[in-house]
Structure formats: C-alpha cells, structure tokens
C-alpha cells in the first residue's frame, strides 16, 4: 500500500518517527503512535472511512477538528471520530458501513461513582492565541486560572501555520512563523504557577446551574467558575454543490492539519475555492509540502485575502480565477475532478464558461463561523462570561492575541486583581489588526542604480511592519509611521545589504538589488521558502514579476541562473535568500521564482455531474438542498420543524456545519429571517460516550 508521508519540508522538522502497527478492515498498516486515526489512514492512502446508511454514500474527512462527524470509524469496537482519536499499537480500526453497531459492554455501570467537581476563579475554554494570551494576563495578575483545550498541545490554529505572521514584532511576533508563536506563548505561560492547563480536555456543555461539563481522560468532570472565558475559535463553512461530500472535499483547515501538523501528503493536486487568507495560505502550504495547486477560485472580483499572499501564489505559477465558483465535484467514490464556472453579476454560473480540472482534492475556504455556543448558553444561564478571539469575531490570529489580552485584563479587573485602566492602545491595535486590507495602489520603483537598495513589492495597506524593526541602519519606515502604511527606505546610500528586510517579510515582498559589482547586471536577492532543491548555485530558474509574469532574460545573456544561496537559519529559519544576476532594466521588477508549469485544464464540461438540488446540506443525515427547498416552499419557517420533516440539522454534530447554509437557503428563497424560528440548542454540544456519563470502566480500567 502506498505510504503518503512528507519526508522533506522546507520549514518543518521532519525527523525519524517511531511507528506502530494497526489494522484497517483486517489489513495490517503502519502509523505514528499518538497521531489521529484519520491522519494514519490518509498516510496509508485511505480516504474513504465508510458509507452512509441512508444512501451508501462514501464518507471521509471534512473538518479534522472534531466539529463534524463525517470521519467516524470503529476503533476497538467503539465508534469514534477518527480526527480526535489517537492511534495506539495494535488498534483494530474498521470502516463504518451503515449504522454503527452498539459496542458490547460487559462491565456494569458504577452506580456509586463520584463525578469530580472543581471550583475555579476563572475557566478558559480554548488554548489558542486568544486563550493563551488571556491566560498570560491573568497569570501576571496572579489569578488562579484553569485553561482547557481538546487537543494534545496548546496553540490552536497557530500549530497549523508555517508562514510568517503579520502585525508588529513587539506586539504580535511579526516575522515569526505561526507554530513558533504558539510555542512561545505556551512557554511564557509555564512561568505562572497560578495557571493550570488541561490538554485533551473537551468542554461538552454549559448548564443552568452555572456548571461547565468537561471530559478529561475518559472521565466526566464538572467545573464551576466565577468567571468563564470562551476562546473556542471558529469552524469552517461549507458550500452546497453536487459532490460536496465526496471524500477529497474538505476544509482548508483540515488540509493544514494533515499537512503541517501531521506531515501527511494528503494530495497530489488540489483546487481551492475561496480567495481569502485561509485559502491562499493553504495553497502556499500545499506547495511547500510538494503538492501541486491547480488553481484558486474566488467568487468576488478580487481576492479577499492580502494581496501579498495572492502574489506569492501567482509568482509560483498558481492561477487565481476571480468571479468564478465551483459547480461540482466529480467522481464515483472520491474526487476525480472539479468543474468551475464564471459568475455573472447576479452570482449565477454563466453557461458555456465551465472548466474542469483533474484533481484529487478540493479545499473549501469560504469563510469561518464562530464557535460561540458555549458563550451564548452561558449568557442565557446568567453566568459572568466573556468571549475572545474568533469565538467573538472572525479575524487574524494576531488580532485574537489582542482580544485575549483585553478580556484577560477585564476579568482580572472584575476580580479586583488589576486596578489600572485597560490601555486604549490594546483596543486600537486590535481594531487595526481586524481591519480589511486596503485597495491595491500603484507604486513606482525606487530611483537610482548605484549601491544596494531594498525594493518593496507590497502595494496594499495591511497591518504589517516587521521590516522597520530589523533594518540595522534604521532606514526603513512606513507611510505616516503607521503599522498599515506602505514601507519605504530613506538614505538608501547607507544600506549595507544585510538582507534582514528580505528575510523577515511575511509576504516575501522585499528584494534587494545590488549594483556594486556590476551596475549593468546587478545581483537581485529574492526570498524563497521552498527548500534548496531547484535553486542550488548554478540552477536555471524562471523569474517572475509581482503578477506572476515571466521576466525573460536577454538573449545575449542566456538563462537566469542562481549565483548564490544565503540562509540565516538561527534568526530566519526556513527562509532562503536566492541571488540571481539580472539585467539592470529588469532588476527592480523581479520578485519571484516560478516552480509550477502553466495552468492545464481539461477544457469545458457542459454537463457537470448532478443537479444543484443534489447538493448535500446536512452531512450527518444526508439532507439535500432540494428536500430543504421543497419544505420551505411548502411553508416551513421553523428549523426545528425541518428536523422533523427531513432530519436536516438532526445529526450528531448538532447542526454545526449545516446551520449557516440552512439560514442562507431561507434567505435565497426570499424569506425574511425574522420570520424563521431557529433550532433549540441543548447540551450536549459535543458527542459523549454514554459510558463516560455512566461511569463504565473499560478493559484497562479507564472510563
């Protein structure tokens, strides 16, 4: 069986790994101890985890974050979410074919077992950037705090990010890679004995007696906090289209989990729908992992993410199709191709513009929804509850850090442990970091063709200025000295060519042009984060401008070849400075190296698989767009009634994925949303084995 592990990565450490054996449908396979079952299956090129009882549709990964139930498998006789269940030596794993059988339990319930109860001044749910930052402020104030997270390491989505972060160096570790920021925050927190962290601990409900129920190591525990902070992050949104639940269609965050956290080569060729930062960054991460990106498709006329992120992809040879959408994912058992089409002014696909890409994976990156059910229920029960990060408002992780700090200080102040005023600068910086990117502007290249000088290829105001902090001569500033101002250099004759600005830039948008040795053919230093292969000294490279257009060499000079590769592994790990000699008239245009071939598509496909009404809305119960539309047109205005008619939203995930789409369907049908009754949310918010609540002991004495 083919093994799909990432064995070499330009940023992440890929060292030797211990292996364990497990079985999948009676076949012996190998995995890493402690990795999630889903990742072990993907690493063994298995993406179909079972078949749905309603229509025998193949089931596989979608969220990789415990938010849906599509990755269900049977592990040692018990149905579990494969993305949340660690692999063990000798584990027997089976696909779920239809309705999972009820596991045999020989041990009787412990009628007298005691539920552990714990009272704490502060409970924080979620150890991502917001939760960690809040805990740090509470730790500094000496507030006894319990921080819990359902993963086996702190950091939240920071763990998945290999790119360098934006913001400022002093406030949000700008220029440092996301996973390293998570480690920094976690290490800082260990200095405070008053903060206790429980990992592998899942909050499952908030109750009317102001108790938060959690499951830790198979045991049910009740926690009664004076103050509750919900920092649970976000979950990925989905799109309705035929084939949208085929194995191979999953969220961009799930892809980053597989590729960056678990070092699984989850795909050979992907197509991405969604041109926000999440989708564009996922495309870059794919290329770092050796995965081809066929294209990025965005419904708007312009990408919603930072232009420097989009520019990085286009320079590498990835086409970005704006005003396009996905029409269908095609395949019998898994994704074999994806059909896209151009959108008209009414957001309808234009007939005849269909284009089909042969890919094995379709990444969905069409936005995020707040994981705020714990916050809303706590408010309903009158708890003193706070909210931070994406659970409060979807924004960048750097903004979540500020949000967490602010809420941490508010909680400390409410407990009388902080008597100062919360700095207004925190709120102001948080708002800046949440702000939308500005409109791209045209900028002229700097004048002069002597000495050595930086060239800034960023044309859009975004909150980012690490280049101003690393210049040894303090020559780099931003317009109006604001974090969103475009950078520029002064007194460039003083530049010594240290290359720090090239290496630190999160957008890889700074080059250095050195005329000192040969003014006619200066040396251009380019940032590069894809490893040394293909850019070794003497390698022939295809250079590109900011828009991804090829910068051709002059016929008299021949090919562009790499002159030298420089690395500062200690200060800027993972970033290479590739030096190439370029004609002076082109030197300030050059910014990238193309590694992918020109776009290849199958052409038009006027008959994509399936009809729009076949799109699955409710993954758990396989409720389709057509069934839900029919009920709405028959007069249904209550989502609870929809559950009774066609089971939409009735599944074990608690409508986490389908709920936003249900509201959109009502809106698309012309129904005023104030006329629609929302579903009633009840505990539990997360699936919990009955044995945990009954005190049933397993074979090894665990709950």
Role assignments for model-derived ranges:
Residues 31, 534-536:
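Short, well-ordered loop/turn sites that connect or cap secondary structure elements
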Residues 47, 504-523:
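Short, basic/aromatic beta-hairpin or loop at an interaction surface
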